[in-house]
């Protein structure tokens, strides 16, 4: 924080913050690939990346239906020279800028395991939503813990493999903290009212506009 003058200014205040630090495991470190990206911070790998890139490339022709002539400025949406995280971020941003909420977009891109899922037997509407989304978007499968923010919502979601740690808590004075481990934020003097961990396919999100 000492490097950035705005962060040292006592007048500087925000309603949320996303912080990510991780060694690159499958690409060479480069500033354009530094995280968090425009909408995402990603801990993990996308093991379906090749199929996802091919699907995205094949779908580019449909961009004109939403964006008209401006679609030419968006192509290519994905780039095989970029990291898996950067390509997922670009795909998510396209969906969000096209009018879908960031939470709905992530549920589509990174769905939970909904087939033969006993917990969803009483929620046919949820199963129907996932089945509909599966027809228009192939899943980006991890292992992946994704932290997201678009200025309207901030949160985190775990892919259906559930192989990345994600712990959260809320405090009596209104803070919501989520991290890959406890202790990321000093909670000395604060009263924790609820805490837990994300399971496979689960999401925690805060609506910054409505509270």
Protein language model features and the residues they cover:
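Conserved short alpha-helical segments that host acidic/polar catalytic motifs at enzyme active sites
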Residues: 1-211
């Amino acid at each position: 924080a000492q490097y950035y003058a705005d962060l040292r200014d006592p007048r500087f205040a925000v309603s949320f913050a996303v912080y990510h630090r991780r060694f690159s495991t499958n690409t060479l470190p480069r500033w354009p690939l530094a995280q968090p990206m425009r909408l995402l911070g990603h801990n993990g790998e996308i093991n379906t990346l090749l199929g996802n890139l091919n699907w995205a490339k094949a779908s580019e022709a449909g961009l004109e239906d939403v964006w008209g002539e401006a679609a030419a400025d968006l192509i290519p949406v994905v780039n095989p020279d970029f990291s898996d995280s950067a390509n997922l971020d670009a795909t998510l941003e396209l969906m969000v800028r096209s009018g879908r909420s960031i939470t709905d977009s992530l549920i589509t891109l990174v769905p939970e395991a909904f087939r033969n899922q006993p917990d969803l037997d009483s929620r046919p509407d949820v199963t129907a939503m996932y089945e509909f989304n599966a027809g228009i978007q192939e899943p980006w499968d991890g292992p992946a813990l994704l932290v997201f923010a678009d200025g309207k919502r901030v949160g985190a979601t775990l892919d259906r493999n559930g192989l990345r740690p994600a712990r959260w808590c809320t405090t009596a004075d209104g803070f919501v903290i989520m991290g890959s481990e406890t202790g990321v934020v000093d909670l000395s003097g604060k009263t924790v009212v609820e805490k837990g961990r994300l399971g496979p396919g689960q999401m925690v999100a805060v609506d910054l506009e409505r509270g």
